[in-house]
């Protein structure tokens, strides 16, 4: 048996509590892709946040640990299995579009719940009880996709970074409120298992940013909340300050939306 530090042993106890009776299906499954090159240190913070969930719902957590040499798997695979998590280990994720959504799919396939909640490994969740309960309630209210506001943590100081954040949030508000385009993103959304697996199999969601428009095009119901207690924080540690960097970002972002969103999703029928 693996020996855990006192801190990890305490976390294991809470994660086992979170899952509850394994002979009973979970109320929801959280799937988190873990890139071994950058996420192994971050995932414990997110797991600690999730372990603070204090209600009675049974929550399954699936980690998809990926991007490592096939002959040298990280020791954390066995550690997280010992901590009560379901772990899918894939040395190399085959992908056509974004690697992030491709890495989520194996975890979604093995989920024991049809209610899938998706986070990135570097996220922080200030109020996991409110957020998880809200997501489960949206499923119970027959929504097919739900998402909440995402803000940033670990941002570098500087006016240029603040301007970048303003532009980022303003553009998302404009797309959501004025253009009616769902702005769910990979670091924080919930979707029905059948929806995302079928859309991915059809090649209609090569990136997470396609999920909202694709679900909408099928007639799926979509819920959004900007409530403060439901906010998820994602890391801005890779952002660099400076006006030159800001201009380059704006040019890149404009080109990104043109490349990724130029093709509107075709009408599709989701099997019931």
Predicted regions and their residues:
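Conserved donor-nucleotide/metal-binding helix-loop-beta segment in metal-dependent transferases, i.e.
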Residues: 130-145
